[in-house]
């Protein structure tokens, strides 16, 4: 696909901040045709270094709460300031996605790019841990790394060059995720599908020099990418 919004984030400085396959491009594809209005209060769930949070604030005009457990909110705030964003429009929050510190029905929407698979595999997560903080009618938009077909009973050797079976347990196919989110009582499934983004977002990641990207090259150079995809899920709170 053509990444119209993301291309301005292809600078060396910003790309060095990504923590996996290019999350900005994944976020752009995820939000194609989205119904979230400008000035909506949005949680960037698992925001990492805050690059997707900047993208959401600048390109869509959302008021963004950049929630992440592992990133330093002080560092993220400095980054947001450097990017010229008003402090009232983007707020870094250090929090656990399973114990969010917000008022009930605080958010108009939630966007989660390349992180939901770490905390959202509990079938009660949506109903118990996330939806209480979303207004009725609000959207939950999720982009996650997945598998074209679950193969945990016979993992391909190419994948094991970079990842352990325990790490691969966080990745599943479309049917797994569709069945999981359909168990949610408080939200309707709008769509769940395989994303077009794959090889290009991986290429952006693999050319980085950090140790995690270097480690992932082993599997991808051996052809492991043919087993992998990205999955988008959109739900709406009832």
Q: Which residue ranges define each predicted feature?
A:
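Conserved Class I S-adenosyl-L-methionine
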Residues: 191-238
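A short glycine-rich, Lys/Arg-flanked "PGG" loop and its adjoining helix->strand segment in the class I
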Residues: 124-139
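Short, glycine-/aromatic-enriched active-site segment of Class I SAM-dependent methyltransferases
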Residues: 145-167
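A short SAM/SAH-binding and catalytic strip from SAM-dependent methyltransferases
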Residues: 109-122
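Conserved SAM-binding loop and adjacent beta-strand
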Residues: 12-28
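A short acidic, Gly/Pro-enriched loop at the edge of an enzyme's catalytic core
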Residues: 98-110
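Short alpha-helix
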Residues: 169-185
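Class I SAM-dependent methyltransferase SAM/SAH-binding core
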Residues: 43, 49-99
């Amino acid at each position: 696909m053509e990444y119209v919004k993301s291309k301005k984030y292809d600078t060396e400085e910003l790309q060095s901040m990504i923590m996996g396959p290019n999350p900005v491009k994944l976020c752009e594809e995820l939000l194609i045709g989205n119904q979230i209005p400008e000035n909506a209060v949005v949680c960037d769930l698992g925001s990492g270094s805050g690059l997707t949070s900047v993208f959401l604030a600048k390109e869509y005009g959302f008021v963004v709460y950049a929630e992440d457990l592992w990133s330093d909110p002080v560092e993220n705030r400095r980054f947001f300031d450097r990017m010229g964003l008003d402090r009232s429009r983007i707020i870094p929050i250090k929090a656990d996605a399973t114990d969010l510190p917000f008022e009930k029905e605080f958010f108009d929407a939630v966007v989660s790019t390349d992180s939901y698979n770490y905390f959202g595999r509990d079938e009660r997560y949506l109903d118990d841990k996330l939806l209480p903080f979303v207004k009725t009618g609000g959207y939950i938009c999720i982009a996650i790394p997945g598998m074209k077909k679950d193969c945990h009973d016979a993992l391909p050797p190419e994948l094991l060059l970079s990842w352990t079976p325990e790490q691969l347990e966080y990745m599943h196919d479309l049917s797994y995720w569709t069945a999981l989110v359909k168990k949610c009582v408080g939200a309707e499934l709008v769509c769940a599908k395989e994303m077009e983004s794959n090889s290009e977002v991986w290429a952006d990641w693999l050319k980085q020099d950090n140790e995690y990207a270097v480690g992932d090259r082993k599997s991808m150079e051996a052809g492991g990418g043919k087993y992998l995809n990205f999955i988008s899920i959109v739900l709406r709170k009832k």
